[in-house]
Amino acid sequence: WVRGEGYDPSLAPRGEFDAAWLDEIVPDRPVVLRAMDYHTAWVNTKALELAGITPETPQPLDGEILLRPDGTVLGTLREWGAWSMVYNLLPPLDNEQRHKAALAASAAFSSCGVTWAQDAWVEDDTLETWLLAAKSGALKFRANLAWFAEPEGVWKTKIDGFSKNRDRLAKEAPDLLT
């Protein structure tokens, strides 16, 4: 899998990105890119195939699979109901992969003068990454962390955990993480 985060969906007309554009670069491996708005994903044909997304796939209630004028799948998936069909197939990142990504992001942000950022999709495993980066001195900017809450209602069972994580941030890395 090739995965990426943070592309600007406004770079294509109507935010409609074509799987064929990714296929030209990576035709043999699934690619999934999450837009900076966290509401859109751009995927290649291989990812669509693995997810079983075809022109006959019913439109999800809480999402949209964009189609080309000829009825074929475009490669842009909007909202949870559509892009979760691909995201649920992604292999999990391990701690080392997440830590390397945090270091790369910190270096990139620092080189541009960024002093504050928000991560709008934090889960328990990524919390550990943020804390490690902050405690090790590798984090060179402040970050506001927002916990991911699944739209299907599972989030309601996680409210206590969200509160405990906030308390933990306040105790362990109050100068860098909020």
What is the meaning of each model-derived region?
Residues 166-178:
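Short, intrinsically disordered, charge-balanced linker/junction segments flanking boundaries
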